[in-house]
């Protein structure tokens, strides 16, 4: 396993641990999700380039599209929650009332 794969795997696990540990604020959860998507994008791109999969060359672009949709939806939810409740604490929100 090369050094780049190890770094991206470590970045993914760090983002996953950050998502599990700092889930009290919605903004920190969104940042950790973006870090996970970025490391997945780099790992998929490097794997496709190393294995010379010509048919799977659209996979990183599709992953970026889903990451952009996730970021837009997350930011719109953050704006909605912060304007309604005045805070972005996830633990204080009751999803049945939203």
From Swiss-Prot:
Entry GO terms, CC: mitochondrial inner membrane; respiratory chain complex I
Compartments it resides in: Mitochondrion inner membrane
Cysteine pairings via disulfide bonds: none
GO biological process: ATP synthesis coupled electron transport
Membrane topology: Multi-pass membrane protein
Source organism of this protein record: Ectophylla alba
Transmembrane segments: 1-21, 29-49, 61-81
Any single Pfam family the record assigns to this protein: Oxidored_q2
Subunit: Core subunit of respiratory chain NADH dehydrogenase (Complex I) which is composed of 45 different subunits.
Catalytic reactions of this protein: a ubiquinone + NADH + 5 H(+)(in) = a ubiquinol + NAD(+) + 4 H(+)(out)
Enzyme class, broadest EC rank: translocase
Phylogenetic classification of the source organism: Eukaryota, Metazoa, Chordata, Craniata, Vertebrata
Protein transport listed as a keyword: no
EC nos: 7.1.1.2
Function summary: Core subunit of the mitochondrial membrane respiratory chain NADH dehydrogenase (Complex I) which catalyzes electron transfer from NADH through the respiratory chain, using ubiquinone as an electron acceptor. Part of the enzyme membrane arm which is embedded in the lipid bilayer and involved in proton translocation.
Name of this protein: NADH-ubiquinone oxidoreductase chain 4L
InterPro entries in the record: NADH_UbQ_OxRdtase_chain4L/K, NUOK/Mnh_C1-like
Principal location: mitochondrion
Any GO molecular function: NADH dehydrogenase (ubiquinone) activity
Gene: MT-ND4L
Assigned keywords, A-Z: Electron transport, Membrane, Mitochondrion, Mitochondrion inner membrane, NAD, Respiratory chain, Translocase, Transmembrane, Transmembrane helix, Transport, Ubiquinone
Similarity comment text for this entry: Belongs to the complex I subunit 4L family.
């Amino acid at each position: 396993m090369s050094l780049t794969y190890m770094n991206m795997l470590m970045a993914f696990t760090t983002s996953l641990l950050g998502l599990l540990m700092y889930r009290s604020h919605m903004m920190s959860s969104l940042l950790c999700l973006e870090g996970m998507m970025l490391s997945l994008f780099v790992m998929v791109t490097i794997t496709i380039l190393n294995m010379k999969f010509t048919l799977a060359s659209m996979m990183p672009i599709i992953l970026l599209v889903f990451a952009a949709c996730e970021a837009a939806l997350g930011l719109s939810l953050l704006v909605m929650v912060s304007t309604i409740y005045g805070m972005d604490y996830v633990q204080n929100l009751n999803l049945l009332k939203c």
